[in-house]
UniProtKB/Swiss-Prot annotation:
It comes from Homo sapiens (Human). This is Selenocysteine insertion sequence-binding protein 2-like. Residues 154-206, 240-295, 320-387, 884-1010, 1030-1101 are annotated as: Disordered. Residues 988-1002, 1040-1057 have a biased composition (Acidic residues). Binds SECIS (Sec insertion sequence) elements present on selenocysteine (Sec) protein mRNAs, but does not promote Sec incorporation into selenoproteins in vitro. The keyword Transferase does not apply. The gene is SECISBP2L. GO terms for cellular component: mitochondrion; ribonucleoprotein complex. GO terms for molecular function: mRNA 3'-UTR binding; ribonucleoprotein complex binding; RNA binding; selenocysteine insertion sequence binding. The modification Phosphoserine is found at residue 276.
């Protein structure tokens, strides 16, 4: 026969209706049914007058079904059978014509083998494969249309199938068929190639010419042993490659069949892509719900038509590769829960969107099935390319090689990327799926790239934060005395260098291998497996699909959510404007600071800057900020005297400690990744707990949203963003706040710092727990966002109370540890300050004491005695100087003694005290100081005594300046004025010709011009001696001389006049003891004369 009879029978298909099985008596059916089944072979049986399709009724099939395992399809009988009965052809061919009543019965022929012998006989004359694929598919659909006419019979024979009688969509029977077939296989013995005869041989390419119609193949029950011996779950999913219409139909039967298995339809919202956990956790039947479409029936079709149908067959054989079998076997044997989800996705995969619950389930099983899903996606993906090929043999080989190659590449890339990522990257902590919501391939690709970038940025950020955690742990252990006192920043330099290398390598790979990386993220990265098979059509096989039928894909899928073609540009908020403005300022300061650091302090600060530079570069790229003054992780560079960052309310600096020491401690502890507003230690346990808590709440929220969006909006679990969190905190709706510790430092009014302080203040007022954990990017990944998130507010943690309580406990411990660490560091810093004060270099009387307070401040008179010593000699022997001064004071009046104490503490300042007079023009000031210094130097030249004399001079100067500080102030004023004078004189002296003296006094001072001439010094000495004699102001002169002697201590060493300071000191002491009252009375006059004399001396010189 040709296809003409087929077409003819299609026209006559309406006549099949009278032959409904129930219209015949059972006795008439028993005879023909018994003959073939009892004999085990139909070869010797006479054709029966009754149509064989009538024998498919339930009672007969059930009785004799087990005997039909042997070849029933003899050509003679099958060919002769229809001749006596004119209805034979009619019942057979209407299958192709999609006649509902007959097709209903043939739907179950696949399960009940009785009619197969007769049916197949009609088609034996067709030697060529039936190539009309789409007709075959339509026929299959037609076959499944009226499956519900026999629900009760099915229920009787196969009790596991439910008794649903309502009409179902096309394809809804397919899951039933697979379920029933599985049970039939369990009932009957293994079948030995029942279909191995000419027309039904299934496997090899040699049987191409003997393949029957696709419809018959789909209805064939007795399969080759390689297929029949497999369990249902082991069959491959060729349904994936059916036409798009078939894919769309497959979703509905899945929903209905799953509802038959006990899950309500509310649990399965195929349109929204939501599947409840109850659904996916069903028994093996549930696993077969969607896999059935793709698996068993298509396996039958493809195996029966191995060479007949072009791409259906190809995909079938391609998917029968061993990896699939192994995976499915694992599913069928033990891993039902996990693999069920994968296989269940196979049916939905073609629909192009996965469900949120599936994402969550996959998220849980991700670590176990990561490689499995990647291999599965690779197995299924290259098969999409098979659509282009018709040479099955050649493509078979190609497909195998392609699969292996792709998978190897995939594993290489995934392992490479994951190995290169930092050990504690959020891949190990933040395991959330990437929310690819679009169904358009191009947009999905862009979303995928964004997701990849977000993942890598999160990994980098968290690696930096983990370094910060290590630093804090070291500080904690150091505070507890567990480690030596090596500075933390030494180790951090290496860590930063390593991190920089990692980041550069990642960026290089991202630039060069963008495409493979995106593939890797889809399958391998733990937080990317939404379900790799589910994502496949849009991600990995995207090139094939795009070139093949991208239009069809785009049009066949309903868009989920709002998707704007052109995103509307958002106007920056007030906060964003402030942030952007300060960023620009910081960038400007970065260039200036960089130049300054490179020029002024090439050794010490340059090293600090290098250490911090990689982090600054990263921060510029990631968040747009650039602030070298932050000096991200090196505490040494953060020890600048004044940190302009407002002290956070939770930090120790706000606890009433007003000393600069506390603020410097805070500056040393905190960095760009651990800002000052944090008052707890960062640790991994808190990060993990926060991640789990947020993921749990997000899953709750999404699940409710899938069921009832209105209710979900009313019962939100989370809120993100500073503005939203602040708004809801004002409404007292927030139960917990999670803040990122690495928010950008924006100190302008209305900036980020102010907003964060407001949030923390409100949390304190409302007694809401606030936690500092993760980082901005990692926090965003926890809540399924690709953008960074600074603050997350929790409305309701019901359902995750254990995690929440654990988080609160960990936070309290971290806060206590932070306080201990700060206290220990403050104590340590104070100790170091006492030890290292002497070693700090000073310049022109400006002290650099621990509090960073300059000598300019009046209040620092008492607090700065040590650091005010300028000469190296005095730095090392300041205690001797104090003792000497005390001894001299004892010989003086009590008033002078008091003044001595105040000023003796600052012997280095006193050298400059005489110039305070010199708040006049430089010449005048120099006059007084030069006269005094010249006298001091002349005396020094006369006596040339050793440095102990210098110490005496210093003490005498201190006492003298106590009584007369050179600014016409008496003892009452002297202590305060002396402090002011200490700085100004030095500054003035720098400007004067006494650069020589200064140079000698301060060899380390930057202004060092040695232009001292012995003749000039001698003239100064002689003039100062004259003034001393005439004015009888030995004290004043001595004081000025002492100033000059201090400043010119080195000058004295170089010049031979070093001897005279001792003489002057003796004369000064004698004068001081002789006439303290005269000193007071004639302060101003003597000073004025000194000025004139000094001017004269300078002019003469």
């Amino acid at each position: 026969m040709d296809r003409a009879p087929t077409e003819q029978n299609v026209k006559l298909s309406a006549e099949v209706e009278p032959f409904i099985p129930q219209k015949k008596s059972p006795d008439t059916f028993m005879i023909p049914m018994a003959l073939p089944n009892d004999n085990g072979s139909v070869s010797g049986v006479e054709p029966t007058p009754i149509p064989s399709y009538l024998i498919t009724c339930y009672p007969f099939v059930q009785e004799n079904q087990s005997n039909r395992q042997f070849p029933l399809y003899n050509n003679d009988i099958r060919w002769q059978q229809p001749n006596p009965n004119p209805t034979g052809p009619y019942f057979a061919y209407p299958i192709i014509s999609a006649q509902p009543p007959v097709s209903t019965e043939y739907t179950y022929y696949q399960l009940m083998p009785a009619p197969c012998a007769q049916v197949m006989g009609f088609y034996h004359p067709f030697p060529t494969p039936y190539s009309n694929t789409f007709q075959a598919a339509n026929t299959v659909n037609a076959i499944t249309t009226e499956c519900t006419e026999r629900p009760s019979q099915l229920g009787q024979v196969f009790p596991l199938s439910s008794h649903r009688s309502r009409n179902s969509n096309r394809g809804s029977v397919v899951p039933k068929q697979q379920l029933l077939q599985q049970h039939i296989k369990s009932k009957r013995p293994l079948v030995k190639n029942v279909a191995t005869q000419k027309e039904t041989n299934a496997a090899g390419p040699d049987s191409r010419s003997k393949i029957v119609l696709l419809v018959d193949a789909s209805q064939q029950t007795d399969f080759p042993s390689d297929i029949a011996n497999k369990s249902l779950s082991e069959t491959t999913a060729t349904m994936l490659w059916k036409s798009k219409g078939r894919r769309r139909r497959a979703s509905h039967p899945t929903a209905e069949s799953s509802s038959e298995q006990g899950a309500s339809e509310a649990d399965i919202d195929s349109d929204s892509g939501y599947c409840s956990p109850k659904h996916s956790n069903n028994q093996p039947a549930a696993g077969a719900l969607r896999n059935p479409d793709s698996g068993t029936m298509n396996h039958v079709e493809s195996s029966m038509c191995a060479g007949g149908v072009n791409w259906s067959n190809v995909t079938c054989q391609a998917t029968q590769k061993k990896p699939w079998m192994e995976k499915n076997q694992t599913f069928s044997r033990g891993g039902r829960q996990t693999e069920q989800r994968n296989n269940s996705q196979v049916g939905f995969r073609c629909r192009g969107h996965s469900t949120s619950s599936e994402r969550r389930q996959n998220l849980q099983k991700r670590p176990d099935n990561k490689h499995l899903s990647s291999s599965q996606s690779h197995r299924s993906d290259p098969n999409s390319e098979s659509l282009y090929f018709e040479d099955e043999d050649g493509f078979q080989e190609l497909n195998e090689n392609g699969n292996a190659k792709d998978e190897n590449i995939q594993q290489k890339l995934s392992s490479k990327v994951l190995d290169d990522l930092p050990e504690n990257s959020p891949i190990n902590i933040v395991q959330t799926p990437i929310p690819i919501t679009t169904s358009v391939p191009k947009r999905a690709k862009s979303q995928k790239k964004k997701a990849l970038a977000a993942a890598l940025a999160t990994a980098q950020e968290y690696s930096e934060i983990s370094m910060e955690q290590k630093k804090l742990q070291e500080a904690l252990s150091k505070a507890a005395g567990k480690k030596n006192k090596t500075p933390v920043q030494l180790d951090l330099g290496d860590m930063l260098a390593a991190l920089e290398k990692q980041q550069q390598a990642m960026k290089a790979r991202q630039i060069t291998n963008t495409r493979p990386l995106s593939y890797t993220v889809v399958t391998a990265a733990s937080f990317h497996t939404k379900d790799s098979t589910n994502r496949k059509p849009l991600t990995k096989s995207q090139p094939c699909l795009t070139s093949f039928n991208s239009v069809d894909i785009a049009s066949s899928k309903a868009k989920k959510g709002k998707e704007k073609e052109i995103a509307k540009l958002k106007r920056p908020t007030a906060l964003k404007k402030v942030i952007l403005k300060e960023r620009e300022e910081k960038k400007g300061r970065l260039t200036v600071d960089h130049n300054l650091l490179g020029s002024e302090e090439p050794t010490e600060m340059h090293l600090d800057f290098i250490d911090d530079l990689p982090q600054e570069i990263v921060s510029q790229e990631d968040t747009g900020l650039s602030m070298p003054s932050d000096t991200s992780l090196s505490p040494a560079s953060q020890n600048s005297p004044y940190c302009m960052t407002p002290v956070s309310q939770g930090s120790p600096a706000s606890s009433g400690i007003g000393s600069p020491m506390a603020s410097s401690t805070i500056t040393k502890i905190h960095s760009k990744r651990f800002r000052e507003y944090c008052n707890q230690v960062l640790c991994k346990e808190i990060d993990e707990c926060v991640t789990l808590l947020l993921q749990e709440l997000v899953s709750f929220q999404e699940r409710i949203y899938q069921k009832d969006p209105v209710r979900a909006k009313a019962r939100r679990r989370l809120v993100m963003g500073l503005r939203e969190v602040t708004k809801h905190m004002k409404l007292n709706k927030i139960k917990c706040v999670i803040i990122s510790p690495n928010c950008e430092k924006i100190q302008s009014k209305g900036g980020l710092d102010e907003a964060l302080y407001n949030v923390i203040a409100m949390a304190r007022e409302q007694e809401i727990p606030f936690v500092f954990a993760l980082g901005r990017k990692a926090l965003g990944r926890c809540v399924n966002k690709l953008v960074p998130v600074s603050v997350v507010g929790i409305f309701n943690y019901f359902g995750a109370e254990s995690l929440f309580n654990k988080l609160v406990e960990l936070t309290e411990e971290a806060r206590k540890a932070y306080k201990d660490m700060v206290a220990a560091m403050e104590q340590e810093q104070a100790e170091e300050a006492l030890k290292n004060v002497k070693k700090v270099p000073h310049h022109m009387g400006h002290s650099r004491n621990p509090s960073a307070a300059s000598a300019i401040s009046f209040c620092s008179v008492i607090s700065e005695p040590i650091s005010e010593v300028n000469e190296k000699e005095y730095e090392t022997n300041w205690r001797n100087m104090v003792e000497t001064s005390d001894g001299l004071e004892a010989s003086e009046n009590e008033k002078e003694v008091s003044c001595k104490h105040s000023t003796s503490e600052k012997p280095s300042k006193l050298p400059f005290d005489t110039p305070p007079i010199g708040k006049q023009p430089s010449l005048v000031a120099t006059g007084s100081t030069t006269s005094a210094t010249s006298a001091g130097k002349s005396t020094a030249s006369d006596k040339e005594e050793v440095k102990p004399d210098d110490l005496e001079w210093a003490s005498q100067q201190s006492t003298e300046t106590g009584s007369l500080d050179g600014s016409c102030r008496d003892l009452l004023n002297s202590s305060i004025t002396s402090t002011t004078s200490t700085l100004v004189p030095g500054m003035l002296e720098e400007e004067e010709d006494e650069d020589e003296e200064e140079e000698e006094d301060y060899t380390h001072e930057p202004i060092s011009v040695e232009v001292q001439l012995n003749s000039r010094i001698e003239s100064w000495v002689s003039e100062t001696q004259r003034t001393m004699e005439t004015l009888q102001l030995g004290k004043t002169l001595n004081g000025s001389e002492e100033d000059n002697v201090e400043q010119s201590g080195e000058e004295e060493a170089e010049a031979p006049e070093v001897l005279e300071p001792g003489m002057d000191s003796e004369a000064w002491t004698a004068d001081q003891q002789a006439s303290p009252g005269q000193q007071k009375s004639s302060n101003c006059s003597s000073l004025n004369k000194e000025h004139s004399d000094s001017n004269y001396t300078t002019q003469t010189t």
